Amino acid sequence: MEDLQLVLFVLGAIAIVAVLVHGFWSIRKQQPRTIKEQPRTPYAMSPGRRDAEGFDADGIGEVRVRKLAPDDKKSEPVKASHDDTFSLSDEPKVRRVKERQEPVLESRADAAPNHAAHERRGHDFRHHEEPSPSARQVQLGLLDDLDQEPSQGELYEEINASVADYDDDYDAYENQPASVDRAEAARVPADQGQAAHSAATQAEPQAKAEEPLPDPRDVLVLHVVAREGQVLAGAELLPCLLELNFKYGDMEIFHRHEDNAGNGKVLFSLANMLKPGTFDPDTMEQFNTHGIVLFMTLPCHGEAVMNFSLMLNSACQLADDLDALVLDGQRQLWSDATKAQYLARIRANA
């Protein structure tokens, strides 16, 4: 009996060992090959990534390994040697630089006209023209007269008195002969002819320099004043001036130039009606005044009638935007009779 148990124990042990061996063999068979046993083929070198000629998408071919022949010898390093001999073949190749041609200097007699022409061209592109000494004196004199500005109460008393006399002045204006209207109507074709002539002159390749203006003989003045009990606020005044193409410039006041961008000659100017008559754009938000004054000297650049019309339209536009009144140079209400007087003064100084 004991022999039978021993035999069964041995057979069971052999069966267990056989099962274990078979299990390890099955696991080893199903396990993939290790990395060392697998061929290392890069992703770019796979057959699916290359064309028929062996080039990949970037145009790079397969890497070729060249075996070193047994008789190949390593290249010996070049030994530095000092040689005092010099040959033309040893010269480094120098890139030829094209010689710069120096400008030929002109004589003083020939360069003077060209220098004057350059000064004229540069003068045309200046944003702010320096006024002539005589015109500057007129502007300074006008600003000095601001010291004698009446108080607001006296100003409105003059306005009320002018309203009472307005009807009489208007009747007298209507009774005037029609010669003024005929002369103004006859002047329109002449103005158009002069405008066409000026345009043709600008089209010429070499335009003559403008002649300097003579000394001012007259000054046309317009006032824009606030209504009684009100003031003109700088926060509202500055946008209106910029919209009307006024540019802040010389003498710390605003100017209207020939070009809307602020280029060219000054046509007329705008100053504060109260002392000292200047503006400060940095403090316009806190600025208040009872009125402003627009003035134009005669003779002026361009057409005086057109310049005056532009100044009058600017004054009326400011009065409409700021709810103000337009007065003449004598601080009277603006009327058609006053306009006729101003036109007569323009024709007298033409």
Swiss-Prot record:
Where is it mostly found? membrane
Q: Which residues cross the membrane?
A: 7-27
Gene Ontology biological process: division septum assembly; FtsZ-dependent cytokinesis
UniProt entry tagged with the keyword Cell membrane: yes
Cited InterPro entries: Cell_div_ZipA, ZipA_FtsZ-bd_C, ZipA_FtsZ-bd_C_sf
A Pfam family the protein falls into: ZipA_C
**Coiled coil location:** none
Q: Does the keyword Cell membrane apply?
A: yes
Q: Which residues lie on this side of the membrane: Cytoplasmic?
A: 28-350
Q: Where in the cell is it found?
A: Cell inner membrane
Q: What is the stated purpose of this protein?
A: Essential cell division protein that stabilizes the FtsZ protofilaments by cross-linking them and that serves as a cytoplasmic membrane anchor for the Z ring. Also required for the recruitment to the septal ring of downstream cell division proteins.
Assembly with partners or alone: Interacts with FtsZ via their C-terminal domains.
Instruction: Indicate the family of this protein.
Output: Belongs to the ZipA family.
- Stated name of the protein: Cell division protein ZipA
